[in-house]
């Protein structure tokens, strides 16, 4: 009982401690182990006869195991153990006892360093016990016992780990059948290979598509070409000029494009009159271009009146009306601003 308590204490020590030598989450591993197997409580019970000779309680033990790592702290493990063959060399009892088993355990681990874990395994073992002796002959028995284990595991490389482990199993065999009912403790060294430990290539997010460029282009036409002085009706040569402009606008074809026609006048006349005249001239241009095929919802008119003169003060000293009309001709104009979005095409990287 004292030995059992010690074994449980060793197993529970797996929680005393912090980075992770355990395999990656949701991966498999497999390995083998070799060690020193010792049977305890090996007295011969059959027919009330005691063994009166040497009993070789310490034997070579071995095993194989495979497991599934759920997360850094929890895994499940299944394994096969050869617990050894224990000879009896007595006068009354002369024979051997051997045992092998399959076990299923939960493996609870906790990191100490980046490549070292301490762990415990808790579960059950299905064993087979065989005995052959001079009194009872050959017998065997099967059963289930709890299994406790504790140890440390060191990640030698990314894929290979080694472990040092002590395992304890109670009551292997039925004394009435195979003559003994020993306990077993095994100290072993194991090596395992972890599958699927490769680092996934980092996923490079595609570069965001560049924002479309806002394009603005302005076409300026002289009002004297489009209209007679002080008029808002297009002249034939003005229509020809707008036909050429329409061709250019059609070739541009900006995405989500729109156009605004701005009408300007000179400073001759009242401000209110010139504002009305600029609006009428801008609308005349819009109506013509819509008739040519530009969608009405993509073009608008705006009268600017006398604002933004391009002549500045160059005509301030001109007094004669005819000369002033000629001097201020650049101020009488129609500007068409076309705005839209242009997709930016980037070359793929080699």
UniProtKB/Swiss-Prot annotation:
Residues 205-212 are annotated as: 4 X 2 AA tandem repeats of A-P. Pfam families: OmpA (PF00691), OmpA_membrane (PF01389). InterPro entries: Bact_OuterMem_StrucFunc, OMP/PagP_b-brl, OMP_bac, OmpA, OmpA-like, OMPA-like_CS, OmpA-like_sf, OmpA-like_TM_dom. Disulfide bonds join 315-327. The chain crosses the membrane at residues 27-37, 59-70, 74-82, 100-111, 116-124, 146-155, 160-167, 186-194. CDD domains: OmpA_C-like. This is Outer membrane protein A.
């Amino acid at each position: 009982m004292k030995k059992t308590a010690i074994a449980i204490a060793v197993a529970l020590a797996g929680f005393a401690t912090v980075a992770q030598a355990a395999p990656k989450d949701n991966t498999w591993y497999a390995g083998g182990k070799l060690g020193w197997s010792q049977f305890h409580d090996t007295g011969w019970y059959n027919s009330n006869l005691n063994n009166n000779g040497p009993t070789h309680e310490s034997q070579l033990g071995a095993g194989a195991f495979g497991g599934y790592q759920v997360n850094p702290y929890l895994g499940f493990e299944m394994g096969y153990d050869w617990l050894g063959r224990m000879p009896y060399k007595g006068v009354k009892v002369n024979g051997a006892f051997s045992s092998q088993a399959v076990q299923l355990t939960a493996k609870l681990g906790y990191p100490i360093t980046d490549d070292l874990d301490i762990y415990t395994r808790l579960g059950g073992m299905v064993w087979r016990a065989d005995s052959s002796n001079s009194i009872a002959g050959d017998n065997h028995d099967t059963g289930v016992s709890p299994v406790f284990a504790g140890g440390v595991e060191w990640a030698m490389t990314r894929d290979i780990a080694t472990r040092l482990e002590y395992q304890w199993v109670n009551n292997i065999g039925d004394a009435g059948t195979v003559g003994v009912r020993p306990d077993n403790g095994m100290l072993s060294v194991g090596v395992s290979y972890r599958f699927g430990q490769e680092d996934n290539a980092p996923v490079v997010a595609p570069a965001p598509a560049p924002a479309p460029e806002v394009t603005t282009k302005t076409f300026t036409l002289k009002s004297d070409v489009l209209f007679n002085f002080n008029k808002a009706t297009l002249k034939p040569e003005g229509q020809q000029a707008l036909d050429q402009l329409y061709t250019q606008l059609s070739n541009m074809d900006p995405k989500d494009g729109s156009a605004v026609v701005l009408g300007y006048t000179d400073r001759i006349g009242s401000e209110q009159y010139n504002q009305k005249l600029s609006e009428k001239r801008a609308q005349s241009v819009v109506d013509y271009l819509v008739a040519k095929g530009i969608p009405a919802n993509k073009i608008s008119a705006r009268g600017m009146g006398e604002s933004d003169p391009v002549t500045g003060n160059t005509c301030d000293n001109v007094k004669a009306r005819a000369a002033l009309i000629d001097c201020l001709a650049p101020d009488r104009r129609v500007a068409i601003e076309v705005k839209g979005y242009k997709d930016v095409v980037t070359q793929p990287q080699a």
